[in-house]
Amino acid sequence: FPLTHINLISVLPVSQEERYKQKVYVRTNEKIQALNQAYQELAQAYHQVSYVDVYSSLLDEVGQLAEAYTTDGLHLSVAGYRILAQALQETL
């Protein structure tokens, strides 16, 4: 068993608004939530692995990637990266 602790970071949400459809393509928050659930279960199965939920911190009131945190519905803006960095600082 390795002695290194592993932090498994959630997959980030997307904005599924019509204007972002081409950029987001086949990604949906429903699929991302299922993947994040699997990541949580994986982390729970191993002593040296923690799950870091950044997904929830980036959502708006309707469950999409908040407009303030994205440049194109998929990639984070500077404000989005601040949220990510804060979550990582709290974990590390």
Question: Whereabouts are the PLM-identified features?
Answer:
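Short, functionally important structural connectors and interaction interfaces within domains
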Residues: 41, 50, 61, 66-68
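Structured segments of extracytoplasmic/periplasmic soluble domains
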Residues: 38-45, 57, 61, 87-91
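Solvent-exposed loop/turn segments at secondary-structure junctions
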Residues: 12-16, 56-60
